[in-house]
Amino acid sequence: VSRHVPLSILDLVSIPEGATAADGIAASMEAARQADRLGYRRLWYAEHHNTAGLAASASSLLIGRAAAVTERIRVGAGGVMLPNHAPLMVAEQYGTLANMFGDRIDLGLGRAPGTDPMTAQALSRSSADPQSFANDIFDLQGWFGDRGTARSAPIFSAVSAGTNVPIWVLGSTVSGASIAGQLGLPFAVASHFAPEQVMEAIELYREVFNASAPTAQIGEPYVMAGFNVMMMPTEEEARRQWTTVQQMFLDVRRGRRRGLQPPVDPASVADSAFADSMLRFQAVGDPKAVVGTLEDFVGRTDVDELIVATYAYDPADRMKSFELLAENWF
């Protein structure tokens, strides 16, 4: 039997059709309390822009609220898309969070803009090339370090100094993996929506991992992989709930702007095969089936942790899946 690695949750704060962003955020905070109670290791908020059905845009604000309503769980960004942000402001925001909530804050960093080219331009402040990304991380570590000063300039941040907020590199390709490895940082791989290079990325990350890099934070490679999960008491219920996710991905593909759709008869979803190919890393079914799928993935990849993404039209169904998963995994 493969190891039951720690489980975490990735939240995109979905907005069901007919609901408001306020509803989505409230449901998300309810789920945060539940995740804390159930023993999940971390709860990370994504960053998305110009999307109708998602309310995770200002991640640091969601993290602050979630950390305030929970006690034990680590809360973090999955992730901050660095091309959209000035690193000093990221240091100040996450340093402030660490000062308020102690060692419970994680900072996952990505190089993608998390949106379409036009919106990216509206947000943009800098290049997304690997060298700037590495330089930004080096500066962030300076601000989070005991001296509280950037590595590239004598700029001080009182609110981040000495907080040592752990930094993760997010990526879905071999390029992201090689950056994470060379910098000696933990790697969160976006297998939940970008399955193409996952196996190669994990392998390359471990191969190039450099524990003696000036940015290194850990002594050996650490991989957390994203997985789409929908666990219900029966296979049939799970398959039906899963149609909400299929519809969501097909909407993105077709440029359709609407909230999360109610579940439908699985046979009625046109192009469901396309959605499932993007969502190759999915565990959908009853407890036994889902646990088996996750065990198999952990066995094949030897990842250190899984971060699950679960979407449902009705927030109660999402929480039911989290509860069943915790009961059957922990």
Map each language-model feature to its residues.
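Conserved, mostly hydrophobic/aromatic
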Residues: 7, 35, 39, 47, ...
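Short, acidic/polar
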Residues: 22-34, 172-178, 289-296
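Active-site mouth loops of central-metabolism enzymes
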Residues: 11-26, 80-88, 161-171, 232, ...
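Hydrophobic faces of well-ordered beta-strands that scaffold small-molecule active sites
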Residues: 7-11, 43-45, 75-77, 105-109, ...
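Flexible, glycine-rich active-site loops centered on histidine and acidic residues
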Residues: 2-21, 83-147, 187, 195
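A conserved active-site cap/scaffold subdomain adjacent to cofactor or substrate pockets
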Residues: 175-196, 201-202
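An alpha-helical appendage that flanks or caps ligand/catalytic pockets
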Residues: 3, 127-156, 197-303, 330
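N-terminal beta1-alpha1-beta2 module of alpha/beta enzyme domains
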Residues: 1-73
